[in-house]
C-alpha cells in the first residue's frame, strides 16, 4: 500500500488586510493569518503478509509508516516592523509508524472470532496547528524538536467474538417437538483495550475550577511526558433475525430484534485528568498551601470546598457509563 495525500490547509490561510493596517495597535501576541501557506502533504506506506492457517483461520501481519510534512503551526516573526507578531507557517512534521497483527476465524461450529493488536509510535514537532501557540506568544525562539504526539496510543487491542445459530439446512442447534428453538439468534461480544493517551504533567497546583487560573501552570518534565491509564471496555449484543411475508406473492421483510449493552462492566475509563495530580476528579488546589489560604478567605469555607469539588467533577473526564438499548431493525 502506498498513498500520497496533498491538501490545502484549513487553518490560518485567510487574508484580512485590516489586520496589517492596524498592526501597530495590536498586541504582539495577536495571531495573523498567512495567505501564502503551502499544501500539507501526507505519505503513507504499508506492507503486509497474510497466511491461511486452516480453511477457516488466517493470520495477517502488517507494518505501516506515515509521514506528514508542511503541517501548519504557529510561529513568531522576529525583527519585523513595526512590531513582532505571531503567524502560521508550514513548519511542523510528524511520523507515525508501527505494526498490526490480526487473527481471523471465519464461522466454524457457529463461532467467529476477529482480533487485532496494534503497536504504534507517533512523534512529531506538534500535534495540531495550535500546539506551539503559547510558546510563540511568549516570545521564545521557534523551537522544533520531536515529541510524543497527543494521539500516540502505544498499544491497542480489538476483539470481536460472535456465536450464532444459522437457519435452514445449516441449523445445528437443539430441536424440541420439530421446532428449531434457536434458529438465527446470536450473541456478540466486543472488547476494546488500549494504553492511555499522553498528556503534559504539571509541577505546581493551581485552580482549574475558578474563572481565572492562578498561578500559571508550570511544565513538569517533557511535553506529553505522562500517560493516562489503560482503558478496557466490553460491549455485548443479543439479537435474532425473523422473516415476515404477508403472502406468497409479497416481498419478504427482514426483522432483527436486538438487546444491546454498551460498557457491559460499567468500567470507569478516564478521558482526561488534571495535570497536577493525574486524577480526573481532583486538581490538588484545595490541599495546596495557596489553596488553603484562598479557602480561609471565603465567607463560608465549607460551602466553598463542597461546590468547588462538585465543579471539578467534569463528566467529560470519563467515558460514558453502562447503557442499554432494546430495538428493532427492519430491512426491506
Residue ranges of predicted features:
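Transmembrane beta-barrel strands of outer-membrane/channel proteins
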Residues: 1-4, 13, 59-65, 115-119, ...
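Membrane-embedded beta-barrel scaffold of Gram-negative outer-membrane proteins
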Residues: 3-12, 20-24, 29, 35-86, ...
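C-terminal beta-signal and adjacent terminal beta-strands/loops
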Residues: 6, 168-215, 229-233, 239-332
Amino acid at each position: 500500500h502506498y498513498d500520497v495525500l496533498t491538501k490545502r490547509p484549513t487553518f490560518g490561510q485567510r487574508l484580512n488586510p485590516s489586520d496589517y493596517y492596524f498592526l501597530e495597535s495590536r498586541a504582539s501576541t495577536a495571531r495573523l493569518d498567512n495567505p501564502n501557506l503551502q499544501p500539507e502533504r501526507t505519505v503513507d506506506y504499508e506492507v503486509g503478509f497474510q497466511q491461511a492457517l486452516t480453511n477457516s483461520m488466517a493470520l495477517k501481519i502488517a507494518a505501516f509508516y506515515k509521514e506528514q510534512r508542511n503541517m501548519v503551526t504557529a510561529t513568531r516573526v522576529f525583527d519585523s516592523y513595526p512590531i513582532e507578531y505571531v503567524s502560521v507557517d508550514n513548519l511542523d512534521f510528524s511520523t507515525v509508524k508501527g505494526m498490526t497483527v490480526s487473527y481471523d476465524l471465519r464461522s466454524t461450529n457457529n463461532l467467529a472470532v476477529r482480533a487485532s493488536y496494534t503497536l504504534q509510535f507517533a512523534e512529531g514537532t506538534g500535534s495540531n496547528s495550535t500546539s506551539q501557540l503559547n510558546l510563540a506568544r511568549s516570545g521564545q525562539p521557534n523551537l522544533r524538536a520531536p515529541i510524543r504526539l497527543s494521539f500516540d496510543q502505544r498499544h491497542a487491542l480489538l476483539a470481536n467474538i460472535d456465536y450464532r445459530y444459522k437457519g435452514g439446512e445449516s441449523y445445528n442447534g437443539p430441536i424440541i417437538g420439530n421446532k428449531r428453538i434457536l434458529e438465527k439468534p446470536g450473541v456478540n461480544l466486543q472488547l476494546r483495550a488500549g494504553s492511555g493517551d499522553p498528556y503534559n504533567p504539571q509541577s505546581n497546583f493551581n485552580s482549574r475550577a475558578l474563572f481565572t487560573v492562578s498561578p500559571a501552570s508550570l511544565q513538569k518534565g517533557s511535553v506529553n511526558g505522562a500517560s493516562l491509564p489503560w482503558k478496557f471496555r466490553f460491549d455485548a449484543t443479543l439479537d435474532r433475525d425473523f422473516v415476515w411475508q404477508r403472502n406468497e406473492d409479497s416481498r419478504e421483510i427482514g426483522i432483527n430484534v436486538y438487546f444491546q449493552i454498551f460498557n457491559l462492566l460499567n468500567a470507569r475509563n478516564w478521558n482526561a485528568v488534571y495535570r497536577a495530580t493525574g486524577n480526573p476528579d481532583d486538581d490538588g488546589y484545595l490541599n495546596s498551601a495557596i489553596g488553603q489560604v484562598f479557602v480561609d478567605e471565603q465567607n463560608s469555607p465549607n460551602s466553598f470546598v463542597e461546590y468547588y469539588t462538585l465543579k471539578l467533577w467534569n463528566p467529560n473526564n470519563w467515558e460514558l457509563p453502562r447503557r442499554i438499548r432494546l430495538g428493532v431493525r427492519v430491512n426491506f
